[in-house]
Swiss-Prot record:
The lineage of its organism: Bacteria, Bacillati, Actinomycetota, Actinomycetes, Streptosporangiales. Coiled coil: none annotated. The chain crosses the membrane at residues 7-27. It is found in: Cell membrane. This is Ribonuclease Y. Endoribonuclease that initiates mRNA decay. The keyword Protein transport does not apply. It is an enzyme of class 3 (hydrolase).
Length: 501
């Protein structure tokens, strides 16, 4: 048994040896195949790398050749520019040398001319017995006098041309605007009459020991006049808004029949609210009539208050509406902004609603109100410039001035007191006499709309007469307030008298 086992073991070992040897041989052959394949791959990669390196080298060589050619071209251009710069520098050096030579020659000639001028001045001073300063002063005086005369002649020619062309067109535009406007004109006095249903009502208005009338005057700020005039009592106040409120208050008291201090206060409060509503409605009606749709409510209310204010007897709100129509029509004729011109003219006197409450002229106050309540700068400027307190810089501002003057200066628009009228005429005469010593007589004619000045012919020539007329007109514009325009006429008359015997 042991021998068999040994044989089996030996056989197994031999088989394993054979299998191992075969496997080793197979592995060796596979390794040789893999090595051959790897060698092929390596050869292929090496060939590809060599080809890529050669192509990259060729591309780099081509780029280097291109860069070298570009550098050569740039070097050639730089060399050409350097040559041009050198030539320009040589030319500039030559020109500088010539300029220095010319400058030296000019300096030499200037010195020579100065020497000759000094010699000539000395000769002239010796010949004329005048120093250079005295001769210069005399020459300047002659030139100034001649320039004044030439300027006066030129001004007269320009004014003549302006009158010939400008006045004709302005007259046509204003005439068209006036004839297209047909506005009503109303004026109020400081006294308002209130009718009574019966004469016995006067006693009830006065009250016991006059307590009702005192309470009425205290609450309303209006004087209540009860006299012998049958069927009416009078309300007197210079403030039109308070006067209207007092009128409504008294009418309510008379209609109710109960008149006592407590009832007076109640009626006054109701009337005050009613007047405020009337002011708003009046402002809205004015906007509707002019054709303006948007405006701050405070400005509308202030505009309505002007319904109860007058200027020289002219209702201010009616004047504003009339001015707005005139400004709009003139703007249309001139091709200007019609809505803006209407707005400027409608608001130009808005400051009069607060002149008794705020310090300052109504033009400045009105401009401040316009800016405060969102109006554009053109409107505010037209308001503050309509009385020349600020120089007018826009067409709308000038149209506002013209519309204001037309509306206030047309016949029947305003009335003035006799005292102010006489003072204005006297001031016109004083201005005319003060302008020149050559004024001999002054006549103010046509209710202050024309000033005729008689001058001394030996003291004033024709050119000076034109200057005197212009100076008088300018001072009248600056110092006086008047409706319409004032014409200044200077008359220079020469008479030669001889007697035959």
């Amino acid at each position: 048994m042991d021998g068999v086992a040994d044989l089996v073991v030996i056989a197994l070992l031999g088989a394993l040896t054979l299998l191992t040897a075969g496997h080793v041989l197979a592995l060796r052959s596979r390794s040789r195949a893999v090595a051959a394949q790897a060698q092929q791959w390596a050869d292929r990669i090496r060939a590809d790398a060599e080809n890529a390196a050669r192509s990259h080298q060729d591309r780099l060589l081509a780029e280097a050749a291109a860069y070298r050619a570009e550098l050569d071209r740039r070097e050639q251009r730089i060399a050409a520019q350097e040559q041009r710069i050198e030539r320009e520098l040589r030319r500039l050096d030559a020109a500088r040398r010539q300029l220095d030579e010319r400058t030296a020659q000019l300096d030499q000639r200037a010195a020579e001319l100065a020497r000759l001028a000094e010699e000539r001045r000395a000769v002239l001073e010796q010949a004329a017995a005048l120093t250079a300063e005295e001769a210069k002063a005399a020459l300047v005086a002659d030139i100034v006098d001649q320039a004044k005369r030439e300027a006066a002649v030129l001004v007269r020619a320009i004014e003549r041309d302006a009158r010939t062309n400008g006045e004709a067109r302005a007259r046509r535009i204003i005439s068209l605007a006036i004839q297209r406007l047909a506005g009503e004109q109303t004026s109020e006095s400081v006294v308002r009459a209130v009718p009574l249903p019966e004469e016995a009502m006067k006693g009830r208005i006065i009250g016991r020991e006059g307590r009702n009338i005192r309470a009425f005057e205290t609450v309303t700020g209006v004087d209540l006049i009860v006299d012998d005039t049958p069927g009416v009592v009078l309300l007197s106040c210079f403030h039109p808004l308070r006067r209207e409120t007092a009128r409504l208050t008294l009418e309510k008291l008379v209609a109710d029949g109960r008149i006592n201090p407590h009832r007076i206060e109640e009626a006054y409060e109701a009337s005050r609210r009613e007047v405020e509503q009337q002011c708003v409605r009046a402002g809205e009606d004015a906007l509707l009539e002019v054709g303006i749709s948007d405006m701050h409510p405070e400005l509308v209310a202030l505009l309505g208050q002007l319904r109860y204010r007058t200027s020289y007897g002219q209702n201010v709100l009616a004047h504003l509406v009339e001015s707005a129509h005139l400004a709009g029509m003139m703007a249309a004729e001139l091709g200007a902004d019609v809505p803006l011109a209407k707005r400027c003219a409608l608001l130009h006197d808005i400051g009069k609603a607060l002149t008794h409450e705020v310090e300052g002229s109504h033009a400045v106050i009105g401009a401040q109100l316009a800016r405060r309540y969102g109006e554009c700068e053109e409107v505010a400027h037209a308001i503050e410039a309509h009385h020349n307190e600020v120089e007018a810089r826009t067409v709308e501002a000038v149209l506002t001035q013209a519309a204001d003057a037309i509306s206030g200066g047309r016949p029947g628009a305003r009335r003035a007191s006799m005292e102010s009228y006489v003072k204005r005429l006297q001031r016109m005469e004083e201005i005319a006499y003060a302008v020149s010593d050559g004024v001999e007589k002054v006549f103010v004619m046509q209710a202050g709309r024309e000033i005729r000045v008689m001058v001394q012919p030996e003291a004033v020539d024709d050119v000076q007469a034109q200057v005197i007329a212009r100076d008088i007109a300018k001072r009248v514009e600056e110092e006086l307030t008047y409706p319409g325009q004032v014409r200044v006429t200077v008359i220079r008359e020469s008479r030669a008298v001889e007697t035959a015997r």
